[in-house]
Amino acid sequence: MEAVSQLAVEMAEDCRQRGYEVNVKLVEIGALLHDIGRARTHSVHHAVAGAEIAKQLGLPEQVIRIIKRHVGGGITQKEARKLGWPKDIYTPETIEEKIVSYADKLIEGARRVPINRTIKELSQELPPPAIERIWKLHEEMLTLVGDCECPP
């Protein structure tokens, strides 16, 4: 999680230098806690479990939203219903949510990896619309921070 946080903070600072309004501290905290739900499960459900843990701890709503919206390029309401999740928004909306979600896609263990590698791996388990959302997030982040990933 520390690697995700470090990359997310770099991205947030890059965004701020480009004139975007970004809460860098929120990005850092959200990135450090984005996988807190893995204490309960290592499945996709860790996003909802993490949001529950964060609520129980009394964390700010902005942090809770980062935790529950970081999975993939977001989870649609239809997908959330199929997963049995509470009705809510599970797609990153704010710049801080998008930064953490994207940074998470570029880190494997403690190493930075190319987005193509992440997408290739996720393509084995996710349907095409979910992969398309990750590509869309990637394209949006390229416009915000440029190419911040490692070489292939």
Regions found by a protein language model. Give the residues of each.
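Divalent metal-dependent phosphate-bond-processing catalytic cores, especially two-metal-ion Mg2+/Mn2+ enzymes
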Residues: 1-22, 33, 56-59, 78-152
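His-Asp-centered metal-binding catalytic motifs of divalent-metal-dependent phosphohydrolases/nucleases
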Residues: 4, 22-57, 64-74
